[in-house]
Amino acid sequence: MRLVDLSREIHHRMPGFATHAPVIITTYGTHDEVREADGYAFSSATLSLSMGDHAGTHVDAPRHFDARPGASTIDEMPLETFYTEAVCLDLSHKPLKSDISIDDLVQAERAAGIAIKPKDTVLLHMDFYRRCHGTPGYVTDFPGLTKESATWLGKKGIGMFGVEAISPGRPGRANYEVHHVCRDLGFTHMEGLVNLDQLVGKGRFRFIGFPLKIKDGTASPIRAVAVLED
């Protein structure tokens, strides 16, 4: 068995959308501060974290993209959503700033030699992190799903899909439409994944990516992991 870490590190001022709160990490306590109790010395180091619920590798709750009363918050989502069978589709040939079409997904599924099943997690490897991490294009240049290709995934009955980018659709209308497809067809998505190249050609595997139990949360950072039975 091999575990593949699919989460990127959360760090101070990491890149993200201006519509989400920035990540601010500062030192709160250091080992320079020594306390004593009954002649016994002790020190501790701690950090202060301020960030939005969409920081880093995260999963969206329906409340994020569904304004209707009763849309689930992250703490209300079933844990089974985040512990599933999974597949990875290779879309690394797609140019930056391009649309992912239905045909792209069909061809990638065929090339993977697997069939997407209901409740699956579908991970979409676009080789975006390697190509754009650390550049201004990280927040603008990613390939993205369209309303039509997201609908194709949703009609497969999947539980969620995941991308390396900070958004599932291209910036602007396409991104809004993909979010609303998730709303209308009852599934969700993850953003900010890494190391998806290690899953290409691996067939079916176990995905684990539990969110924090944030009351009324619209999303949550996750530690996403693929479990490969080598």
Regions found by a protein language model. Name each.
Residues 1-230:
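Active-/binding-site microenvironments in catalytic and ligand-binding cores
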